[in-house]
């Protein structure tokens, strides 16, 4: 499809180029003399000149269509073969499953599900608590850094505004870990309840 579009674009370009070229010639000849313009008009031969490209267009289009059809046929054949094999493969195990494994699967499925679900639920609280615990040190480290910054600011107060700022920052930094700890305890308790 892309090749046909590309070929069509290539063919359209020379035709337009041809027309522009001939029009330029036509005006030039008209300036020279009417006889030359008349002689150049058959020399232009606008009807025959597009005809051979259109003819090749048709041939190329037919050729491309044939190629596309062949490709589609090949694709269909390739698709049909795996589909047949897949259908056969799906059909052949399904009776065996129904005969042999269906009861075993029905009996066996709930037990693995029951064992899998708590197993899935158990790691998730540990993961959440681990992430919360990992988040808590970062917040406490940030709070320590904030407190250190506040201490530095308190040690070297460049302005009178910094001392009132530092206690507010320290209060916020102190409150942040508490919030984190509350969230941690709540999440862990919720996960315990969930488990």
UniProtKB/Swiss-Prot annotation:
Q: Where is the composition biased (Basic and acidic residues)?
A: 176-195
- Which Gene Ontology MF annotations are present? DNA binding; zinc ion binding
Q: Biased-composition ranges for Basic residues?
A: 17-29
Per UniProt, subcellular location reads as: Nucleus
Biased segments, Low complexity type: 33-44, 66-81
Gene Ontology annotations for the cellular component aspect, listed alphabetically: nucleus
Region described as Disordered: 16-57, 64-83, 155-195
Sorted keywords for this record are: Developmental protein, DNA-binding, Gap protein, Metal-binding, Nucleus, Repeat, Zinc, Zinc-finger
| Gene Ontology BP term (one) | segmentation
Q: What coarse category fits the chief subcellular location reported for this protein?
A: nucleus
Query: Disulphide bridges in this chain?
Result: none
Task: Report the family membership.
Answer: Belongs to the hunchback C2H2-type zinc-finger protein family.
This chain's function reads: Gap class segmentation protein that controls development of head structures.
This one is known as Protein hunchback
Gene it is expressed from: hb
């Amino acid at each position: 499809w892309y090749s046909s579009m590309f070929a069509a674009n290539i063919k359209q370009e020379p035709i337009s180029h041809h027309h522009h070229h001939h029009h330029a010639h036509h005006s030039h000849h008209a300036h020279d003399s009417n006889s030359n313009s008349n002689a150049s008009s058959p020399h232009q031969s606008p009807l025959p000149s597009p005809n051979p490209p259109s003819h090749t267009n048709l041939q190329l289009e037919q050729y491309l269509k044939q190629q596309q059809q062949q490709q589609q046929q090949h694709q269909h054949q390739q698709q049909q073969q795996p589909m047949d094999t897949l259908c056969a493969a799906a059909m052949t195990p399904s009776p065996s499953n129904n005969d042999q494994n269906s009861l075993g699967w029905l009996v066996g499925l709930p037990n693995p599900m029951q064992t899998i679900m708590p197993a899935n639920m158990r790691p998730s609280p540990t993961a959440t608590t681990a992430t919360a615990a990992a988040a808590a040190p970062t917040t406490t480290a940030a709070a320590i850094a904030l407190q250190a910054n506040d201490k530095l600011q308190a040690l070297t107060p460049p302005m009178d505004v910094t001392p009132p700022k530092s206690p507010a920052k320290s209060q916020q930094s102190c409150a942040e870990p508490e919030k984190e700890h509350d969230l941690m305890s709540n999440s862990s308790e919720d996960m315990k309840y969930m488990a």
